[in-house]
Amino acid sequence: MAINIILLGPPGAGKGTQARRLIDERGLVQLSTGDMLREARSSGTEMGKRVAEVMDRGELVTDEIVIGLIREKLGQGGKGFIFDGFPRTLAQADALQALMAEMDQRIDAVIEMRVDDAALVSRISGRFTCGNCGEVYHDVTKPTKEPGKCDVCGSTDLRRRADDNEESLKTRLMEYYKKTSPLIGYYYVKGNLNPVDGLAEIDEVAAQVAKVMDKIPA
């Protein structure tokens, strides 16, 4: 049976880094809401046309549409899926739970990346990425070996997100805690919440995630 996990954590907690490792090491597929919407929009399918119409009107895509896209992805099979950025609310969590039951699947583990807010702001405000290959760097903890040049691909296209500044980060954290924090209690009650230390070294976080994954029944 496919393994389905949810990654929870505030912006910059390291969800993307750990998702990439799970993709590479365990063959899971990452289901990112943004990626699914962009893919659907360009697909030309009936669902894709609905997505395009909503986005072209500048409106938010409904939970019903997102669940429809997830249903399509789950129907394609595979070793399993990583839910990143969904669910964000209790209503979405309930809808996902119902979809899983309908498709005779389950959420095997919810991995919560726990972080200290002040440390998180420090971490993200120094972050930049390679626009070519996506490698992530940090001014203090992971600078490039050669200033202005990516260690991996050699590109000089190094970028900082416009909202990776202290004020914007505090706003994003407040939004996360207001909307998404209730999910922690939701999945705790269901018995599949697994906290990990999101501020540990990347390899240590990966080791904690691996322990969670290895406990999932085959």
From Swiss-Prot:
Q: Where is this region: NMP?
A: 32-61
Note down the stretches annotated as region LID.
Answer: 126-164
Question: PROSITE patterns recorded for this chain?
Answer: ADENYLATE_KINASE (PS00113)
Q: Which InterPro entries match?
A: Adenyl_kin_sub (IPR006259), Adenylat/UMP-CMP_kin (IPR000850), Adenylat_kinase_CS (IPR033690), Adenylate_kinase_lid-dom (IPR007862), P-loop_NTPase (IPR027417)
Which annotated residues bind ATP? Answer: 12-17, 127, 136-137, 200
GO cellular component entries: cytoplasm
Q: In which pathway does it act?
A: Purine metabolism; AMP biosynthesis via salvage pathway; AMP from ADP: step 1/1
Under Gene3D superfamilies, the record lists: P-loop containing nucleotide triphosphate hydrolases
- Localization annotation: Cytoplasm
The protein's Enzyme Commission number: 2.7.4.3
Does the record bear Kinase in its keywords? yes
The reactions it catalyses are: AMP + ATP = 2 ADP
Residues at which AMP binds: 33, 38, 59-61, 85-88, 92, 161, 172
Which terms in the Gene Ontology molecular function aspect does this entry carry?
adenylate kinase activity; ATP binding; zinc ion binding
Q: Name one GO biological process term.
A: AMP salvage
**Sorted UniProt keywords:** ATP-binding, Cytoplasm, Kinase, Metal-binding, Nucleotide biosynthesis, Nucleotide-binding, Transferase, Zinc
Specify the superkingdom: Bacteria
Q: What is its main location?
A: cytoplasm
Q: What function does this protein fulfil?
A: Catalyzes the reversible transfer of the terminal phosphate group between ATP and AMP. Plays an important role in cellular energy homeostasis and in adenine nucleotide metabolism.
What is known about its subunit structure? Monomer.
Q: Which family does it belong to?
A: Belongs to the adenylate kinase family.
Q: What is stated about domains? A: Consists of three domains, a large central CORE domain and two small peripheral domains, NMPbind and LID, which undergo movements during catalysis. The LID domain closes over the site of phosphoryl transfer upon ATP binding. Assembling and dissambling the active center during each catalytic cycle provides an effective means to prevent ATP hydrolysis. Some bacteria have evolved a zinc-coordinating structure that stabilizes the LID domain.
Name of the featured protein: Adenylate kinase
Q: Which organism is it from?
A: Paracoccus denitrificans
